[in-house]
Amino acid sequence: MSSNKLLFFVDEGGFDDYTPLFARLGFSVDFENSQRKAVKLAKKNKYQVLVAEFSYNPEFRDRVSNIESLLATLESHSPEAKIIILFDKINQTQLDQLKQRYKTDCTLAFPVIEEKLMACFN
């Protein structure tokens, strides 16, 4: 089994499942669509990469997005993890706010082009 672990967090979905691509790149993939369960996984495992779907909801009172708890957990449990964010262009302003607070290595707007996603791993 691969020692390279990747956490793939999908909130709303509606895009391709990149799990086979991540496996071809040599990663053992944990796929999660529950933010709470993703945080639990991040506490239990050391990840080399997080690929997460960014969602903004104006009803969030104390945060900008759906992934802040996950990013905070990774900062303490897997600080070296590469952070790749997938997002809708209409949420660019909110993503920029998130990027001021948390490390991000690569951000890709939908529709995600597989070659650009692969380039994020280099």
Region roles according to the model:
Residues 49-76, 92-94:
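Conserved phosphotransfer microenvironments
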Residues 62-65, 85-107:
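Alpha4 helix (beta4-alpha4-beta5 surface) of REC/receiver domains from two-component response regulators
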Residues 33-49, 55, 59:
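Acidic, metal-coordinating helix/loop segments flanking the phosphotransfer/catalytic sites
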